[in-house]
Amino acid sequence: MGRRRSDIYEAVRRVLNYPLEDRGDYSIVYRHRVEGVGEVLREARLESVARVDKWAVHLVNGDSIPLHRIVEIRGPRGETVWRRGLGWLEDLSSRRRTAD
C-alpha cells in the first residue's frame, strides 16, 4: 500500500475507533466524479460508514469511496481536523469520552 493511501487509511480508522460521543458529527470529504461536470466535493457522515479497508471506505448504503479520493475529515463544528498532505490539524485525543 502506498504511503499516501496508508496515511488516509490510518486517519479514517483513528476517527472511527475513538469513543466519540457522536461519530455522526464527523464527516469525510471526498472527490466524486460527475459525468459532464467533472469532479465535485461530496461529504459523507461517519455514522454512514460500515467499514474501512486498505482500499476504500464502505458505506451502509453499499457505496464505496476509494481512499485516494478522500481529501479531508471534518469535525463536529465543520472544522477540518485532518487534510490530505497536511495530516492532523487538531489533536482529537482531547475529544475522547472519559468513563464516569
Curated annotation (Swiss-Prot):
Belongs to the UPF0248 family. This is UPF0248 protein APE_0939. The lineage of its organism: Archaea, Thermoproteota, Thermoprotei, Desulfurococcales, Desulfurococcaceae. InterPro entries: MJ1316, UPF0248. It holds the Pfam family MJ1316.
